[in-house]
Amino acid sequence: MPAFATGSLTIPKQKIAPWLDKIKNGSAVATLSTPMPMTFGEGESWTFDIGEAEYVAEGGAKGASTVTATTKTIKPFKFHKTLRFNEEVLWADEDRQLEVIQEILDLIQPALSRALDFGVFHEVNPTGGAVVAAMTGGLTGTTNLVEYVAADKPYVSLDAADALVLADGFNPRDIALDPTYAAKFSALRNATTEQKLYPDFRLGTEVSDLDGHRASVSNTVRGSGVLAVDTKALGFVGNFDTIRWGVQKSIGLEVIRYGDPDGGGDLKRYNQVAFRSEVVYGWGVADLNAVAKIHDLV
């Protein structure tokens, strides 16, 4: 059983393993792209363009094959969530301690998951919403831009985004949508039968189908209430495997009983205890042309 002493908690595997999976899969980026195994620190990811195969006639000579390599730097970014509670939470008996740990893990997980989206989409610190200078190359920087027109059906802007991605030689198989944009698709019905036009589309983060796209819905796409400057993004469309990311290190749960770990005052003075969890993501975007942004600036 875990003991509420200062330091990292030893959490049973049946508790920590599913929680770590939720951390990795609780964001739109993680849902639509493939994570890479990573070690801690800055690294590189390569993509190769080898062109097409060459036909060789009988007795003919073979020509040279060219390989164009593109290198993308992957940088580590650490996020934490620290929660304070009255120290009475430490007095729980052993059976209740596991319940307390599970409740705390459940509180922390969504914030750490969403941090990946805020970094990859917007290059911002989720606390305060300010742009982080070290985070560069986020999807918001793509030059493939589509202006949403309220008078149009929502699939008009989606089709336009698809066309931009296709023109750059990529497959627009994925879309991350803000809930307000997603709701417009969900509301579309056949004028005669009143059946939904997209019956397999769901309004959650989990993958569903939207007009032939793998779709994930999250308010991290626009970041309302988080971003210091509203980008008015409604969706990111493209091939999300251009995002090279992974979890470099994760710390399950740490109990802090002394000091001032978050600037909120001395724990002992206020009869409090802090629980902290941290995750280090590594990410980089191989090619921003693989993605188009739909926004509503007008």
Residue ranges, per PLM feature:
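Short amphipathic
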Residues: F79-F85, S277
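A short, structural micro-pattern
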Residues: T66, F77, G169, D209, ...
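Assembly/oligomerization interface modules of large self-assembling protein complexes
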Residues: P2-K81, A290
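Protruding loop/beta-arch "assembly-hinge" segments enriched in small, turn-prone residues
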Residues: M1-A30, T34-P35, V255-V298
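Short helix/loop capping segments that flank catalytic or ligand/cofactor-binding pockets
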Residues: Y55-A57, D93-E94, K184-A187, G284-A286
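Extended oligomerization regions of viral-like shell subunits
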Residues: V149, Y155-R257, G263-D266
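Alpha-helical scaffold segments that mediate packing/assembly in large oligomeric complexes
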Residues: R84-D168, K293-V298
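Short loop/turn segments at secondary-structure transitions that flank enzyme active sites
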Residues: V89, R114, Y181-A183, V221, ...
